[in-house]
Amino acid sequence: DPDQIRLHLEVLFAELAPDTSYPDGLLALRFLPPNSGRPIRKLFSWGDRDAAVEMAVRANADGMNGYVGVHPRKPGTSRAGQAADVGRAYWQFVDCDDGAASAKLLELPFSPNFIVTTGTQPTQRLHGYYMLEAPETNMAAYTARQEALATAVGGDNVKDAPRIMRLAGTVSYPSKDKAARGYVPELVT
């Protein structure tokens, strides 16, 4: 769904818009085949977000799983996923890959700014995103909060700043192993 893809990118990367604090930051997209094969990685400027949406639609239609780097990459970055490529964080997030962790996320006394549902079969899977009051440049402090949030809900230990997460508006295609465990292709919303 190109509209959901665009919305997800625009919410995550509002700080890249002109006249904001980080106009030269880059958004990172990655597309992975469900079983094996070559990934596709691409960095986009804020002004190229239409091309980012188009690429996501095409790659997903070709059976690739869509992911987005949660935080912008530094201007001039040519890679997609190294810690040194992320100079500031705008979000804390949590990856709940099972129903128990997803339920705990929804029970926390502080609600996420937004939630991405990555699947419902065989169990509910959610990503919760919390916008920071100010961009974080102390990556050690950021990582410590990521660990605490994951521990609080029993989520995946996704603590690194260059982390990629499922891209809303794309279909999640399970691997053969996951399909055998009851996962089915589902729209990430």
Regions inferred by a protein language model and the residue ranges of each:
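Extracellular-facing binding/remodeling surfaces
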Residues: P112
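A structural signal for short, well-ordered beta-strand segments and their strand-loop junctions
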Residues: P23, A28-R30, V116, N157-D160, ...
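Secondary-structure transition/turn motif
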Residues: W46, Y130-E133
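Short, conserved phosphate-binding/catalytic loop or strand-edge motifs used
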Residues: I115-Y129, M165
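DNA replication initiation on ssDNA origins
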Residues: D1-Y90
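Short loop/turn segments at strand-loop or loop-helix junctions that form parts
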Residues: R30-P34, C96-D97, T118-T120
